[in-house]
Amino acid sequence: MASKRLMLDVEEEDDESGACGQENFDPHDADMEYQAKRRKSAVQETPLQWMLKRHIPASTTVLSPITELSQNMNGARLDGTPKSTQRIPANRTLNNFNSLSSRTLGSFSSSCSSYESGNSLDDEYMDMFEMESAENHNLELPDDLEVLLSGQLKSESNLEEMSNKKGSLRRCLSMYPSEQPEEAVQEPDQETNMPMKKMQRKTLSMNDAEIMRALGDEPELIGDLSKPCTLPCLATGIRHRDLKTISSDTLARLIQGEFDEQLGSQGGYEIIDCRYPYEFLGGHIRGAKNLYTRGQIQEAFPTLTSNQENRRIYVFHCEFSSERGPKLLRYLRSNDRSQHTHNYPALDYPELYILHNGYKEFFGLYSQLCQPSQYVPMLAPAHNDEFRYFRAKTKSWQCGEGGDSGIGGGGSRGLRKSRSRLLYAE
């Protein structure tokens, strides 16, 4: 009730002042008074009050600045004079101001909540208005319709001006590609005083097949690579390519003395029969020695203290030269290599051979060179007990060193396993 009385008192005072003003009305004084009040209200008006004015319901006559400006511009085009220069009666101005202030005070509480949204909308409206004004300022519309249809839609000068201006962070595709070539992106020069890093180069690693292929290109050499082989070796149809293999014909020629000149007066050969004793006693090559365990190989081939310049040839074989003979030959070569680890490729026994297809083939071709001239197979039924005994004896090396030192059995020098069979290659 108190607020209503206050508003009625204010309206009565305004009516009285308006009545007094009508008696002594002077158009020039009213205009000056209106301009002064307008400047004063613009100075004292806060952004909050201005926003509250914008949010007054549509029934009032107060409009937003953009709408008012557009109406003024339209009115200026229609009437010929802008509305800002037209004089407004003082009474209507004062009445509008009073009613506006009363309505503003009444809607203050409801308008505070929408301040933030109005502020953001106002910023967008102002940006759009500035863009429209800039486009209208630069746009020159032709008067003739024919020129409008045949001319360019956009002038190049406007495009250049817009490109020179700093745009927003968003990128857009230009429909007018520039003729200037794009500058290549150059990396910054590195400092010349930087220390040089050492490059680690990978060493060439050759497998066994490559090494054997390389050795195959060279002439047949003995184990220490110092001399060519005395006996001709087989190149094809052999089982053990890492071992020098000779045929039964070559061994027969060696026994018959055809290679004595190459061996020299103090040289010689020796045949190692790796079969079991009952096989050896049943028939063997003339002059052969029976060695079937690794311990016997170690005793028969000790380490030499001095270099032997005389050539000595050793031919290994068993019944078929498939297992026992090649194993003992490789064992001898392995021990020999281990004794000369720091003096490669020196060897005490460099010239070792394996007989192709063993005693069985040699006996079938040259039985006259065998004594006694007989052939007892390993699996002969009459020697089953002996076979089991010697077989177990030669396999005892797999269970450890000690005892009898059969194939692989213990001895003064243990067998070191090699990752490559080249260790035994001659």
From Swiss-Prot:
**Pfam family membership, one:** Rhodanese
GO function terms (MF aspect): protein tyrosine phosphatase activity
Annotated disulfide bonds: none
| Tissue specificity statement from the Swiss-Prot or TrEMBL entry | Expressed in developing male and female germ cells.
Stated EC number for the protein is: 3.1.3.48
Identify the residues that the record assigns to the Rhodanese domain, covering every copy: 265-371
Instruction: Quote the cellular component terms of the Gene Ontology held in the record.
Output: cytoplasm; nucleus; spindle
Where is the stretch described as Disordered? 1-27
Q: Which UniProt keywords apply?
A: Cell cycle, Cell division, Hydrolase, Meiosis, Protein phosphatase
Q: Active site annotated at which positions?
A: C318
Enzyme class at the top of the EC tree: hydrolase
Q: What stretch or stretches form a coiled coil here?
A: none
Q: Which GO terms describe its biological process?
A: cell division; embryonic pattern specification; G2/M transition of mitotic cell cycle; male meiotic nuclear division; meiotic nuclear membrane disassembly; positive regulation of G2/M transition of mitotic cell cycle; positive regulation of G2/MI transition of meiotic cell cycle; regulation of meiotic cell cycle
Give me the reactions it catalyses.
O-phospho-L-tyrosyl-[protein] + H2O = L-tyrosyl-[protein] + phosphate
Cell cycle is among the record's keywords: yes
Asked if the keyword Protease belongs to this entry, the reply reads no
InterPro entries referenced in this protein's UniProt entry, alphabetically:
MPI_Phosphatase, Rhodanese-like_dom, Rhodanese-like_dom_sf
Instruction: Family membership, please give it.
Output: Belongs to the MPI phosphatase family.
Q: What does this protein do?
A: Required during meiosis. Regulates the transition from the extended G2 phase to the onset of the first meiotic division.
> Which PANTHER family does this one have?
M-PHASE INDUCER PHOSPHATASE, M-PHASE INDUCER PHOSPHATASE DUAL SPECIFICITY PHOSPHATASE CDC25
Protein name listed in UniProt: Cdc25-like protein phosphatase twine
From the UniProt record, report the name of the gene that encodes this protein: twe
